[in-house]
Amino acid sequence: MIRLSLPRWLRRLAWLLLALVVVALGILLGRAFEARGKPELMPWHRLVLAAEVHADSLPAQARWADYLAREQRLFDELRSALAAAPVSGRLRYEVDSHIGPAAAARDWNRSFESTPPAPRGGVLLLHGLTDAPYSVRGLATLYEQAGFAVIAPRLPGHGTIPSGLLDVRWQDWRAVVALAMRELRARVGPDRPLHILGYSNGGALALDYTLDALDADGDALPRPQQLVLVSPMIGLRPYAGLSRWLPLFGGIEYFEKSRWLDILPEFNPFKYNSFPVNGAVQSYLLTTRLQARLLALASSGRNQRLPPILGFQSVLDGTVSSHAVVHSLFEMLPANGSALVLFDINRASLLADMFKVDAANALDVLHDDRPQTYRVDVLGNADPATLALVERRYDAGARDAVVRPLQLAFPPEVYSLSHVALPFACDDPLYGMEPRMDEDFGIRLGTLRLRGERGALVVAADQFSRLGCNPFHAYLRERIAQTLPPPPASGAGAAPSP
């Protein structure tokens, strides 16, 4: 018998790799046991809705009407499934719940659309991860008033139950984006502008689609002429990539909770609180692909074909990487009229001296005095002694700022904006600090003022204290309006708003 003698270094390497695998499996198994201590899974964490759309079940010649018909079947199935597994209680999905739209009201968990008689353009609005089309409905009115056709699709896995994100893939979202853009082009005609507005994960999808459209032949994928990105998900925290391994043992019923990062009560009518690992994994796969494509585009010089991008980003963002928005997106852009609005922290807040060093220096990390190919607008305190707001504008190629006072101010209790705050006005009936009363969804998250002993709730206190609306929403709308074509001259027959 011939015996193979491996070099000593190779044997040591093999043993080291084996040891690392054993340690990794031990850590994942320990995490699976730890996950068993999470709250109990409910029907909305386990149900599988067969009518949900996936890319491989969407025919190549599918139309927008087909998607809406499939969505109707999905919500019919959802109602039947929840009725067959009733759970007593007052929260969302529970039998005594009043959380959600009234029976006769529009369900903002579903896709919505509007088309005026003579559209001046079209806009696709893409919501974020765990969200629903509700998160872009406020900004949709801006485009409707400008005579634009509007389509806001419900992306697969969203708007129904949290388990919808257990098996969704980012390719499913991409397929629906392409379908909706083709419908939008058909509605507005070949010579009208198309815009895409993406919030959070929707921002990543907007960019990914745009890159696909640049590479597509002919009119297979209509190209947008303008992108608006609100808190765009360009990059995630480094540990997000490791999360794909967390549910390794999740296929075993005993460890099924390891498929979830959060298992929480559902009290938001238009957003999931519970969050499966797969949702984070799909966003990570999408954003890593996107960053690589943007870098390759800039390196080849083909970034000149990109449309102008208007971005809005809080310097403090607990969901996405603000650093990636600047360095992986905007620094990859040509001089094409793009602009980035940064919302600074409130340096006149009573809490200003309590900021962590990283938070206090967040703006300096994102913006310095180097000339850029894009315009930068920093919204912040006029000085550290006042709540009054100014815009510091750095034009493309400029080192010095042009300062413009604004008729805006930080609310005294707000020390910063947040990832989730930007698209919502402060009179939003769900998230607003001063909500309109013309709509009632059974809860007003923006006005909750909870007090009690710490550690008593299964929901972390910061979920209620996180700012959910934008005190500077009027500025955001004004800047978006500047990307729209000017209204027709008097007497030219402007298209009426739907």
Model feature map: region roles:
Residues 197-206:
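Gly/Ala-rich beta-loop-alpha elbow adjacent to hydrolase catalytic centers
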Residues 102-158:
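Short, surface-exposed "cap/lid" segments of acyl-processing enzymes
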Residues 227-239, 345:
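Active-site nucleophile loop of the alpha/beta-hydrolase fold
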Residues 161-193:
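Catalytic nucleophile-loop/oxyanion-hole region of alpha/beta-hydrolase
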Residues 113-116, 271-456, 470-478, 482-488:
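Serine-hydrolase catalytic core
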Residues 196-198, 230, 312:
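Short beta-strand immediately N-terminal to the catalytic nucleophile in serine-hydrolase-like folds
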Residues 138, 208-212:
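Active-site signature of alpha/beta-hydrolase-fold catalytic machinery across serine-
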Residues 2-122, 222, 406-415, 424, ...:
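Flexible, membrane-associating and regulatory peripheral segments of lipid-active enzymes
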